[in-house]
Amino acid sequence: MLASLSLGLTAALLWGMHDYIVRLVGGRADARAMLLVALVVGAVLLAPISLMAEGWDRFTEFTLGLTALSGFFYALGAYGLYRAFTIGPVRLVAPICGAYPLLSVAFHMARGGEAGLGVWAGVLAVVLGITLVTRGEPGEAQGGRLEAIGWSLLAAFGFALTFGFSQWAAETAPELSVVWVARLFACLTA
């Protein structure tokens, strides 16, 4: 339990740092180039531990298909996130992008999974937390608000489908191999 909590908090911290950096350089760098750099660095860092993981023999064609979909939707979602943060304002786009857990839970339920009150409370806490943190963010849109909303929605749907397909694939193969192969497909997509 403590290991899961530590990993979750570490992931949240790193993802937050990532989003902050994207916001800092978003207006000065090409979104696709930033995405490709992040994907390649992630793939390189994951490679040693993923390739040494056991269970590659359980990686079937079906798993490969799910993993390819996960990688495709991750690249799509991340590109949407980068574009949304470039346009801003953060107080508009972050809550929309951050609402992907709602869609992830819906995907899980569509596959026959259950979501109890605790899951929905967690999702609500995430969305409200993002909204509260970004509420006071200064800045105006660098483009049309509808365009920013569109890219934000693409990010939310992309991330929700990423996690949905990744979790499905991880039911049949080791998580590390699923994440790494999805990252490779995302690199090819970007």
Describe each region flagged by the PLM.
Residues M1-A33, A141-S177, A182-T189:
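Glycine-/small-residue-enriched transmembrane alpha-helix faces in small-molecule transporters
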